[in-house]
A protein has these predicted regions:
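Bacterial N-terminal signal peptides that target proteins for export
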Residues: 1-10
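Bacterial N-terminal signal peptides
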Residues: 9-19
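Histidine-/acidic-rich catalytic cores in large beta-rich domains
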Residues: 23-340
Length: 340
């Protein structure tokens, strides 16, 4: 077994993953998913394209999500709605496309008084979480859990009126939703002027507000997500996750304008850490990786960077077009096993 060590000025640190010991500052091995235009791309750690999925109509909003069966969930803008949710880019249509390119599910969800914004979250039970805004720009809107039915149908099985729970003082629109299967809780981040992170109880229909953080943000919040040892959108445990380095249970978000990725501990109600980084004015994403590194996208840029816990860039990919978000999936994730 090959052992690597790195001497830091605060001592000797090493990270145990599986049966080998690797540097915490090494890139986390896996596949990175992002989209440009109508196409989603999967790249390996050597920056080679492994696979791609293409939608036939509409435009992909924010990011696609790779599911355990190798299919991809897309939030799409195919038109048909009457207004933009709180001024955000709308989606309104959700598609699942298989590894081989077959459309497995194509469902449109909007109404006269609500339109989904650009994010969606896959769930372990096969459902999806959708954030939708009202025509009135100052109110955040609602969360909907939708159960897919057939090839073109869906049923709302849970909802949370975020505007009602947070009150009239919180203004802005929801632009990110993230589910924590271990806690059965939903995280949202709300755009300016509120600049708020909020957590809601998903375990029952009351959907009570559990946590709210609105301290010290002056930028535009995007891509808020849980730090979890589960693969994104699943309840499948990541086998090589280092819970201590990851700081499981914290939440992280991009704060454009502040030029930071901000991490908060909802248990202690404290800001844990911030990564200084050059962000754009729009969108972006941040993901804590199983080795403690952090994957960051500057929204509407062509750059994906992986930073170690000292803020050093250890892996970078320049894409061929502008992207909104990107997510890394480990080598042992079911969605990529035996697919390439």
């Amino acid at each position: 077994m090959k052992t690597k060590y790195k001497l830091l000025n605060v001592g000797l640190f090493f990270l145990s993953i599986s049966q080998s010991i690797v540097l915490a500052s090494d890139p986390y091995p896996g596949y990175t998913l992002f989209s440009i235009g109508r196409t989603a791309y999967l790249y390996d750690i050597d920056k080679k394209k492994v696979h791609q999925w293409k939608v036939s109509e509409g435009s992909i909003q924010t990011s696609p999500y790779l599911l355990p069966d190798g299919s991809v969930l897309f939030p799409l803008n195919k038109g048909g709605f009457t207004f933009r949710p709180g001024g955000a880019h709308p989606s309104g249509t959700f598609q699942k496309i298989s590894w081989d390119g077959e459309v497995l599910w194509d469902f449109s969800f909007f109404g006269d008084n609500f339109t989904p914004s650009y994010d969606v979250e896959p769930m372990p039970n096969g459902n999806i979480l959708v954030c939708a805004g009202f025509e009135e720009r100052r109110r955040p809107g609602k969360l909907f859990e939708i159960k897919p039915i057939g090839k073109n149908g869906g049923e709302v099985v849970w909802e949370c009126n975020v505007s009602e729970k947070l009150g009239d003082l919180v203004q802005g629109y929801i632009n990110s939703v993230s589910f924590n299967p271990s806690l059965d809780q939903v995280l949202v981040n709300i755009q300016a002027p509120a600049r708020t992170l909020a957590i809601f109880d998903h375990s029952n229909s009351k959907a009570n507000l559990i946590f709210k953080w609105d301290k010290g943000f002056t930028g535009r919040l995007h891509g808020g997500c849980w730090v979890t040892d589960r693969y994104l959108g699943t309840n499948i445990q990541i086998p090589d996750a280092d819970k201590k380095l990851m700081r499981i249970g914290n939440i992280i978000t991009v704060s454009n304008g502040d030029n930071q990725a901000v991490e908060v501990n909802p248990k202690t109600n404290e800001r844990v850490e911030s990564f200084n980084y050059e962000f754009s004015e729009h969108q972006g994403s941040v993901q804590r990786l199983p080795n403690g590194n952090t994957l960051i996208v500057s929204g509407y840029s062509q750059q994906i960077n992986e930073l170690d816990n000292n803020g050093k860039i250890v892996w970078s990919l320049e894409t061929s077009g502008r992207i909104s978000r990107a997510y890394r999936y480990g080598l042992k994730y079911q969605g990529v096993l035996n697919k390439n």
